[in-house]
Structures are given as structure tokens and as C-alpha cells.
């Protein structure tokens, strides 16, 4: 438990974005909405969510299909959106002389359009308020969401590397035992796809919050978090049916193909008096990888 006390509490104490509908724009960038059919059945039925991505490098192609806009667009966000997410910096335009060569690896900016089921959003906010009111006065769903995002990146990386010994204090024993059998039998490219780089996580949402008591009177809270992330793992498209594929241009010549995958992690904590305040992962689902 010492390892969990050092790792998970650190993950679950930082700022995040609210799960309301968020629309971000960067200057002179077109917007494209990802069809909901590309999401997994679990996420569509339970959340009614969608995530859309549009590479900044594909701006020229989209400009031919969309009406011309002004040269500068303001950044739009909902009230209270953290500045770290709301202010997507635009890549500065730079001209090169004949003796100067452009960088070959430039970061590609993405536009994320998030849509949250309003009923689910209200329900999770009410339950988050109950946790704050009755269990933990320091609890914040926005801070928890950001911490869960960091925990997801850390745990998924260890999972892809089959470092199960380092997950013993972070993941429930019965869940870890089942994961060992599934992950070890996966091909290497599927294992690589399990790892989510925190910079490639494009959308995070609170799926559900459960508050319950067991027969002994112990108090538990379960929070289901859903993540969408890009991966460069070489996975045949016919293997992951329904997964979205993007071609991201790096620099002027290199083009990298990425796939949009989804995962669901359920975090659990016992709030019984006298019990250590440790969050553990009670369920791990990687759509189309761990089925």
C-alpha cells in the first residue's frame, strides 16, 4: 500500500476540465465532427459522447470545402474552463531562408469537440457534491478527473510493458489476475497500443459515479472515467473495426498514421473511518484490445 499512497494520491490532486460541452478553436482552423458510430458501443450507450479531431496540418484541404473565415478566431470555452486546456496555443508561422531548414518534427495541433450527455453530466455532478458534502470536504471532480488522466497514462504504460508487479498496489487483485492472462497473450503491436501518452489523450469524461454501503456498513465510492487517445502502434485496420484512423503530417514531408482508441478505468475508494484514503483501479477496459 505504500506505493499506492505515493502514486495515486499524487495523480488525483490536480486540475482538469469540466465534462460539459466544450468547443475549442484555434486561429484559422477548420472544425470537423467525428461520427458517433466510430465510438465503442459501451461509450455511446452509457455516455452519449463524441470526440472529433482535426489535424492542423490538414487546414489547406478543409479550406477548400468550408467557407472562408476571418484571419483570427477567438478561443471559445465554457465558464470555469482551466486555462491550461482552454488556451490552445497556435503554432507561430515562420518563414525560412534558403540556408535555413524547417524542423522535421513539429507538434500537430488538434481541435477537440466534446459532447456530454446532459442528464449524465448533471447526475455525476450531484453525486460529486454528495461525496464532498458527506465524505471528503477536499474532494473536487475536476481535480479528480485530471489526476485520473495522469493515473491512466501511468498504469496503461506499465500494463503495455507487462510490469504487473508494479501494478499490484494500484489495481485490484482480481482485476490484475485477469489482465495478466489477457495482456500476455496479445501480440506486441496490441501491447504497444495499450499505452497512452498523456499528450495523446484527446478527451476525458466522467462516465458514472456510484456511492454504496456493503453489508458490514463500509462506505465505498466508484468513479468510472472514460478516455480517448491517439496511438501510433502498427495495428491492421481490419483488426480494430470501428476505430478511426488519422494521418498526421509531421514537418513538411513525414506523415504518421494514428488511430483513435478508447479506454474505461473505474477508480474505487473506501471512505470508512480509519481506512487509508487510497484510490485503486477496480476495472480496466480497452475497447477492441482487451475484449
UniProtKB/Swiss-Prot annotation:
GO cellular component assignments: mitochondrial inner membrane; mitochondrial matrix; mitochondrion
Annotated organelle transit peptide span: 1-96
Keyword Nucleotide-binding attributed: no
Species whose genome carries this gene: Homo sapiens
Primary role: Promotes sorting of SMDT1/EMRE in mitochondria by ensuring its maturation. Interacts with the transit peptide region of SMDT1/EMRE precursor protein in the mitochondrial matrix, leading to protect it against protein degradation by YME1L1, thereby ensuring SMDT1/EMRE maturation by the mitochondrial processing peptidase (PMPCA and PMPCB).
The keyword Electron transport appears for this protein: no
Quaternary structure and interacting proteins, as annotated: Interacts with AFG3L2. Interacts with SPG7. Interacts with SMDT1/EMRE (via the N-terminal transit peptide); interaction is direct and takes place before maturation of SMDT1/EMRE.
Localization: Mitochondrion matrix
Molecular-function GO terms, alphabetical: ribosome binding
Protein name: m-AAA protease-interacting protein 1, mitochondrial
Keywords: Mitochondrion, Transit peptide
GO biological process: calcium import into the mitochondrion; mitochondrial calcium ion homeostasis; protein insertion into mitochondrial inner membrane from matrix; protein insertion into mitochondrial membrane
Amino acid at each position: 500500500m505504500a506505493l499506492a499512497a505515493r502514486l495515486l494520491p499524487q495523480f488525483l490532486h490536480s486540475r482538469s476540465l469540466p465534462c460539459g460541452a466544450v468547443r475549442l478553436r484555434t486561429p484559422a482552423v477548420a472544425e470537423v465532427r467525428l461520427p458517433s458510430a466510430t465510438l465503442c458501443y459501451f461509450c455511446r450507450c452509457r455516455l452519449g459522447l463524441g470526440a472529433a479531431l482535426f489535424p492542423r496540418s490538414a487546414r489547406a484541404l478543409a479550406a477548400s470545402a468550408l467557407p472562408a473565415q476571418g484571419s483570427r478566431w477567438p478561443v471559445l470555452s465554457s465558464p470555469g474552463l482551466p486555462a491550461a486546456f482552454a488556451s490552445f496555443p497556435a503554432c507561430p508561422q515562420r518563414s525560412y531562408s534558403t540556408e535555413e531548414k524547417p524542423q522535421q518534427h513539429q507538434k500537430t495541433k488538434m481541435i477537440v469537440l466534446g459532447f456530454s450527455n446532459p442528464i449524465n453530466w448533471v447526475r455525476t455532478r450531484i453525486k460529486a457534491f454528495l461525496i464532498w458534502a458527506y465524505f471528503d470536504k477536499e474532494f473536487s471532480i475536476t481535480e479528480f478527473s485530471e489526476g485520473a488522466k495522469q493515473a491512466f497514462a501511468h498504469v496503461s504504460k506499465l500494463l503495455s510493458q507487462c510490469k504487473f508487479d508494479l501494478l499490484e498496489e494500484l489495481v485490484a487483485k482480481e482485476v490484475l489476475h485477469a489482465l495478466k492472462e489477457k495482456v500476455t497473450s496479445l501480440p506486441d503491436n496490441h501491447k504497444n497500443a495499450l499505452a497512452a501518452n498523456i499528450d495523446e489523450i484527446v478527451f476525458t469524461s466522467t462516465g458514472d459515479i456510484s456511492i454504496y454501503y456493503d453489508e458490514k456498513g463500509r462506505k465505498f465510492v466508484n468513479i468510472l472515467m472514460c478516455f480517448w487517445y491517439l496511438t501510433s502502434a502498427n495495428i491492421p485496420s481490419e483488426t480494430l473495426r470501428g476505430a478511426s484512423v488519422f494521418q498526421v503530417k509531421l514537418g513538411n514531408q513525414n506523415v504518421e498514421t494514428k488511430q483513435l482508441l478508447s479506454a474505461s478505468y473505474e477508480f474505487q475508494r473506501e471512505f470508512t473511518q480509519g481506512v487509508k484514503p487510497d484510490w485503486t483501479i477496480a476495472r480496466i477496459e480497452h475497447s477492441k484490445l482487451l475484449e
